[in-house]
């Protein structure tokens, strides 16, 4: 996004809703160092956090840094969100690996013939710019891809005498497959034997990722290191926000920068969004009033989205969210049950499970909270006005 400021086309210094580059990457020094160490030692890593906390940007930063430091790594990145079963996963797995280890159409054709000839690979150039994609001549429905395709990273690592790091986003999707547990066993059995390969697995649904990697009855239990991303601290946000304002000839005090970050509970996505909105409304110096008006505009913008979310819930689920937003803690007390019309005390467990499955709430010990801080604020300030 760009604005005209003093007749100069100026780039907005805050980014959200996409994987950010080096200039927009905020702190995460410890997490980046840890992930780089895991890459160097080929330690499998699962990254777990709520949605929009910067997992993809962290992986991108680590991959970029490692690639600059050494040319002995092949990085493969894939997103399996659209995969509905194991066959689609296998196809995506093979396509992603072939595409990302090949620098040209000729190179891709050569690699495909060498490594996946049984799938009858076809290469097509999709536009005048020379972008190309790979497809398979076999019909995976009538001629299923064999699970041995999972050994492809190690095969390539051995042939090319390099280390391979496979980064899989939205990994929790495999938990939705039919016979999900059986498929997870297949993945674990193949991947744990690969000595020159590491896997970085991350996803946007925290509770599902926890069930895959944190349950000792599941195949991926102790598959590798588990990284829980913490929130970026207010102090680090202040450094970033003040610096970005200053770099574009505007100013914001540390107090106001802290107020901005804490207004959205230091949530990475929303801090960037609120900082951008505040920057756009600032001529010279950003104030708390500017931050407040910017936050109001974000609430207005998201109003319909939040209404649609509430429309998918039962009355008691909506009531329970309102109770959480109001700061209630003793959910099974007669007073709270009556005030919010939550039904019986036994119903609270059912409500928690349902809303957690929808990724609307999170639970830490005895604390129950709404994952999305702006949604929580909307519930407190606007929902009851509808």
Label for each model-derived stretch:
Residues 1-50, 68:
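A short, basic N-terminal segment
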Residues 2-14, 300, 304-386:
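C-terminal leucine-rich, beta-strand-based interaction scaffolds used for sensing/assembly
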Residues 49-53, 57-165, 346:
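P-loop NTPase nucleotide-binding core
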Residues 65, 277, 354:
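Alpha-helical DNA-recognition elements
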Residues 135-205, 214:
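Conserved Walker B catalytic segment
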Residues 206-224:
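Short regulatory helix/loop adjacent to the ATP-binding pocket of P-loop NTPases
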Residues 225-235:
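Conserved AAA+ ATPase "SRH/arginine-finger" region at the nucleotide-binding site
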Residues 238, 242-304, 365:
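Amphipathic alpha-helical "lid/sensor" segments that cap RecA-like P-loop NTPase cores
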């Amino acid at each position: 996004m760009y604005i005209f400021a003093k007749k100069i086309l100026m780039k907005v210094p805050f980014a959200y809703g996409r994987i950010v580059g080096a200039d927009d990457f905020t702190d995460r020094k410890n997490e980046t160092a840890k992930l780089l160490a895991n890459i160097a030692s080929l330690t499998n890593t699962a990254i777990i956090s709520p949605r929009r906390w910067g997992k993809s940007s962290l992986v991108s930063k680590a991959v970029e840094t490692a690639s600059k430091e050494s040319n002995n790594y092949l990085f493969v990145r894939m997103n399996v969100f659209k995969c509905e079963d194991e066959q689609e996963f296998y196809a995506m797995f093979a396509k992603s690996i072939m595409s990302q280890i090949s620098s040209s159409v000729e190179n891709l054709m050569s690699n495909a013939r060498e490594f996946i000839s049984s799938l009858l690979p076809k290469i097509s150039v999709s536009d005048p710019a020379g972008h190309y994609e790979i497809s398979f001549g076999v019909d995976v429905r009538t001629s299923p891809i064999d699970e041995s395709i999972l050994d492809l990273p190690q095969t390539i690592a051995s042939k090319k005498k390099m280390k391979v790091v496979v980064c899989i986003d939205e990994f929790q999707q495999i938990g939705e497959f039919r016979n999900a547990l059986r498929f997870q066993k297949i993945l674990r059995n193949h991947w744990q034997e690969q000595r020159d390969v590491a896997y970085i697995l991350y996803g946007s649904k925290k509770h599902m990722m926890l069930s895959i990697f944190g349950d000792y009855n599941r195949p991926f239990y102790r598959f590798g290191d588990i990284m829980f991303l913490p929130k970026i601290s207010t102090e680090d946000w202040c450094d970033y926000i003040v610096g970005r304002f200053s770099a574009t000839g505007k100013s914001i005090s540390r107090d106001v920068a802290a107020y901005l970050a804490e207004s959205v509970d230091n949530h990475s996505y929303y801090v960037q969004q609120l900082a951008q909105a505040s920057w756009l409304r600032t001529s010279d110096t950003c104030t708390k009033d500017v931050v407040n008006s910017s936050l109001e505009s974000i609430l207005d913008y998201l109003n319909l989205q939040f209404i649609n979310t509430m429309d998918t819930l039962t009355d008691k689920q909506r009531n329970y969210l309102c109770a959480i937003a109001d700061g209630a803690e003793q959910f099974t007390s007669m007073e709270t049950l009556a005030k919010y019309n939550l039904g019986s005390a036994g119903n609270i467990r059912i409500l928690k499970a349902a809303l957690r499955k929808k990724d609307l709430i999170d639970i830490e010990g005895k604390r129950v909270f709404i994952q999305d801080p702006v949604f929580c604020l909307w519930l407190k300030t606007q929902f009851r006005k509808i």
